[in-house]
Amino acid sequence: MGLLFAVPSFVWAMGSSLGAESTVSPSLMKLAHDRVTWFVAVLWVTGFLKLFGAALGIGLTRRRGRRIGRLMVFCGGGATVLLVWHGCLFVAHGVLVEAGALSAAPDLIGLTRWYLYLWGPWFIVGGLAFAAATTRYVRRQDARRELRLYGAVGALGALLLSLASAVTGIG
């Protein structure tokens, strides 16, 4: 699944809008269409981060060395928080728009529904999958207490990054 999740980022980074026109914000589509350098770079980096996430998910299926295990649990905790947070923001925004508590331009209502019913839940499920894989990995190790600490630090770091991003309006 992680590999499939990376495909759109690479497709869009190469200049195609396949699958994006009705599911992605028009402002982001414009940046991609205009080939804005920093945005194209973000698409490439995002694609590679998704590939890293796929490798991490696969890596969490087996015992690894002590250092690699710590790093994987740290990243697994961070990925859990980032994905669940991101998905919950999409869902919460969509629910508020659907309930009439927030307004959206009429041409964005359909897009809001994509984020509410597809993208938000997709991110949440991905985050929960990372949580399950990371928890399972930790439970099979001898140094559970130490690994839990690495996972907690990764999760806390991701939460702080997400909060800072939300407060500054960057993400």
Tell where the protein language model's regions lie, with residue ranges.
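Interfacial non-cytosolic loop connecting adjacent transmembrane helices
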Residues: V24-L28, V91-Y115
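Perimembrane loop-to-helix junctions flanking transmembrane segments
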Residues: E21-V36
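Individual transmembrane alpha-helices with interfacial aromatic-anchor signatures
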Residues: L108-V125, E146-V153
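Juxtamembrane boundary at the C-terminal end of a transmembrane helix
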Residues: L160-G171
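N-terminal signal-anchor transmembrane alpha helix
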Residues: M1-A13
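Core segments of alpha-helical transmembrane spans in multipass integral membrane proteins
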Residues: D34-I58, G77-V81, W85
